[in-house]
Amino acid sequence: MPLVRRTIEYWIDTKMIKDASGAETGELICYWAYAHFIDANAGPLIAAWDYVEATGDRDWLVRKIGRLEKVADFLISRDVDGDGLIEATQSGNLHTLKQPNRSCAWWDAVNCGHKDAYTNALCYRAFRCLADLETQLGRTAQATRYTAAADRLKAAFFPTLYNEKTGLLGWWRSEDGTLHDYAAPTICALAIDYGLVPTDAARAMLDRLWQKMEEVQFTRLDLGLPTNLVPLHPGAYLQPAYGAPKQPDGRDTFGIYMNGGISAGHSLHFIAAHYQVGDTARGDRVLEAMLPRQFRGEFQNGVQDQASKGIDWTTWDGQPSGYEGYLADSFRFLQAVLMREPALRMKLLRPVLR
């Protein structure tokens, strides 16, 4: 846990952006010098809760609570229209993500922005985590503030991002009002994991994703789950970039990198969503398919640093589709071994599940 503590401190103490006057804004750099990643702020808040929960280090929390609040308050300031959702700086409108810019989230080559489902789910967990930390310190007013932020976000999330036509969540709703739904398993599943989707709708959503996998003939569960089961529109991808589609239907690069490629680590959320709704059998079906591949060491192929050489992403037939080769994220799905146990799932996700 000292490494976790050091990592949190590195980001919240040394990677906060300053405005023209030199004042800290609360926004954190994501990687290199890239800013405007909403999840860059949510992640350290969640990690701080993990650290304190695991260690009971209240002295550290007392020293860092002000920094954590500044990080969270930046997120609250990004609810620019007051609906409860955290709006990204990026519009998410088609054809607006151009080099050298990046999107608002881990999926940095996908043109997600404005009201983004992935980052808002993480912000929801982050607010709940910080509220719990404030409660541990007896800071009632602050706990109420972050609880209210989480409540507002939850109230707006499903009505804003649910697609009644498909029964799935859209990945993001762009500034022009368009809901961008590409049948994205991780996006739907993460929201289910965190209780942002009503139970009946959650079960139906998972059913629909299985149906969609059958429709598109995806069978390689040993690899994990594709990013999306419907090809991305060319304007929904960073241009120009590795994996960027050129054909109007997006099929020319479908299955490559972030246009429907497979990043094994994110399969955690799809597996865990089944455990969350009581469908252990289908969650285990994916986990048990992936474990032998992990045992053989096939979710990494060493440092590559070359497009189409890294096994950190694969195509639907298991060919390399990434560029890093070794990516620690890839092994995140192993957490599902713990998440299948109700008591451990509640322990890890207590702020969002209680």
What are these regions (language model features)?
Residues 84-86:
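Acidic, glycine-anchored loop motifs typical of Ca2+
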Residues 32-35, 39, 43, 47-54:
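Hydrophobic/aromatic-rich effector regions of fungal transcription factors
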Residues 347-354:
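Surface beta-strand/loop "capping" patches
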Residues 48, 67-82:
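Active-site cavity-forming subdomains of large catalytic enzyme subunits
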Residues 1-13, 28, 66-73, 114-136, ...:
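Active-site core of glycosidic bond-cleaving carbohydrate-active enzymes
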Residues 18-35, 96-115, 176, 248-249, ...:
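Acidic/His metal-coordination segments adjacent to aromatic residues that form catalytic metal sites
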Residues 51-54, 58-60, 70-72:
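Hydrophobic or amphipathic alpha-helical targeting/insertion segments
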Residues 74-81, 95-106, 118, 122, ...:
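Calcium-binding acidic motifs and repeat modules
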